[in-house]
Amino acid sequence: MVESRRAAAAASAYASRCGIAPATSQRSLATPPTISVPSGEGRCRCHVARGAGRDPRRRLRRRRWCGRCGYHSHLTGGEFDVNRLCQQRSRERSCQLVAVPADPRPKRQRITDVLTLALVGFLGGLITGISPCILPVLPVIFFSGAQSVDAAQVAKPEGAVAVRRKRALSATLRPYRVIGGLVLSFGMVTLLGSALLSVLHLPQDAIRWAALVALVAIGAGLIFPRFEQLLEKPFSRIPQKQIVTRSNGFGLGLALGVLYVPCAGPILAAIVVAGATATIGLGTVVLTATFALGAALPLLFFALAGQRIAERVGAFRRRQREIRIATGSVTILLAVALVFDLPAALQRAIPDYTASLQQQISTGTEIREQLNLGGIVNAQNAQLSNCSDGAAQLESCGTAPDLKGITGWLNTPGNKPIDLKSLRGKVVLIDFWAYSCINCQRAIPHVVGWYQAYKDSGLAVIGVHTPEYAFEKVPGNVAKGAANLGISYPIALDNNYATWTNYRNRYWPAEYLIDATGTVRHIKFGEGDYNVTETLVRQLLNDAKPGVKLPQPSSTTTPDLTPRAALTPETYFGVGKVVNYGGGGAYDEGSAVFDYPPSLAANSFALRGRWALDYQGATSDGNDAAIKLNYHAKDVYIVVGGTGTLTVVRDGKPATLPISGPPTTHQVVAGDRLASETLEVRPSKGLQVFSFTYG
């Protein structure tokens, strides 16, 4: 009887989680309960909890496991054995089924897409590997191969033959170890470096500086044997078979791989953005791995060439000490040159003969779609797919996901955290925003108006601040931006994109409307449709407290400033985000001198003078630095930070704005109608420009 009840309970759990009906309510385990699944394919994941009866058929083979008990099965129309869908393992457990939307692509198509990404990544890496960006590291790669004969040739004829053979093998493998270390660090740092630094609250260039220090140390060890012994001393207590020292080349490759990251082309720039926003999936990993492999093959060719020359030319074999000193000197010179960004001048002097090839293979629709994965689907957020963007009626999209990984709170008593479960009984609006985002600045007056109008009627608002730029991670900057926008409701600081990812968000702004039972009922991405959102808020408030007296809708008094015509897309100056650069030459990280092109395409920008570019924005590095912008809009805003002045030239008339303090938004054009125009912005030296936005 107990077992029968447990079976029935399991069937009910499946039904409630997957939205399907049990075919029977009570059966013994000898005749397991079944569940009817609607026609069409879906997916269910089984997660387990302790305390239920064993399944006598748990040893059935040909099962796929995931999660903790974790049977993972595709379901199609028909009846399915509950116990076989979620087999028990070794302990007594009960299972619950969580519905997960199926990938609509056929299996063959999914495999084809991954193979396409692999091919595109490999070709993109190969093109990068033969581009001018490899020139700064070529001497070190070449000499690392030439030095590989050291261990084999210096070994004395007397002594154990096995030792000489081991040294010869190590010498032969040295070029492969150098390139292997480069591929590993190149891929890992590019994919995970930004996220790791954000988690550790370290500067975004911390890994690069660590690699420069390591490069200098390796070079000094090659020149001074006593210093090399000091470097290896901390590893002396480790069993020799486990030591991976500088001499085998792997450490040198690790350092070079970090410093090789700025050479990445458009594909790796997209991967950097994916890594920073925690959208790392199979496609991103495959693209990164194949890109790193493709980029490393030309370098391996040069390393092996150095090795072959050293083996065949007697002078190399007789002067191994001099070769070590030369290798160390070149390594240190490379590190010093990278500190002062000298290789950038060499890269600018030589035309990038591979730029057009990289653009051709990186602009495909498939790649863009697969890198923009829409967040990681998990048991908490799977049912968000049931909501359509901006629907005019309430929908049911599952229990609201948790506010994960929040690094701090503002506008709460003592800045203490808020748990969504504590707000049950209230209608909750989750608003994703960033204080320098002009789209958010246009939307937030409506959110503030709703909060002021309905907070006494049962509405709670939480603003989840997910930074678009590094400076937006500073709590003081967020607090100042919130005060300027009149925000008094609680703010959750989502600096690590954890909540952003858990809600599968991709937009600034975005609203998630949650009813009094904790269920997501409406999702709106972007600006506009404020009257629809407010109508649904009022409907949920009435559902939570029938007969509640509500004030007049605030949308009648707050103007809707959402642009209705097609405007120039938001213009980013960060190396990893730039999409509409219309100037000549490469737009790469580092300091460079630019000039305007003879003509500037619509909805694009160009630079003039000396600029220092990074993944956040562009910093004026000279007194002649300027930006020319061809835009289509009524209003133009610029996000800029630092101390100095910003001169805006429009229709030949200059206007100067004083700039002081952390980066924030400044309006540079306030037009009276939508128009296509060109303007020039001249920031004083030291100002950092992040983006243009339009209204």
From Swiss-Prot:
Offer a single GO CC term for the protein.
plasma membrane
Write down the superkingdom of origin.
Bacteria
Cite the InterPro entries for this sequence: AhpC/TSA (IPR000866), Cyt_c_assmbl_TM_dom (IPR003834), Thioredoxin-like_sf (IPR036249), Thioredoxin_10 (IPR041017), Thioredoxin_domain (IPR013766), Thioredoxin_ResA/DsbE_sf (IPR050553)
Membrane-crossing ranges are 123-143, 179-199, 205-225, 254-274, 285-305, 325-345
* Chief place where the protein resides: membrane
Q: Which GO terms describe its molecular function?
A: antioxidant activity; oxidoreductase activity
Annotated Thioredoxin domain ranges read 394-542
Q: How does it sit in the membrane?
A: Multi-pass membrane protein
The keyword Protease is annotated on this UniProt entry: no
Name the coiled-coil region(s): none
Q: Which CDD domains match?
A: TlpA_like_DipZ_like
Q: Which UniProt keywords apply?
A: Cell membrane, Membrane, Transmembrane, Transmembrane helix
UniProt record, GO biological process:
cytochrome complex assembly
Concerning PROSITE patterns, the annotation shows:
THIOREDOXIN_2 (PS51352)
Q: What subcellular compartments does it reside in?
A: Cell membrane
Provide an example Pfam family for this protein: DsbD_TM
Q: What is this protein called?
A: Protein DipZ
Q: Give the species.
A: Mycobacterium bovis (strain ATCC BAA-935 / AF2122/97)
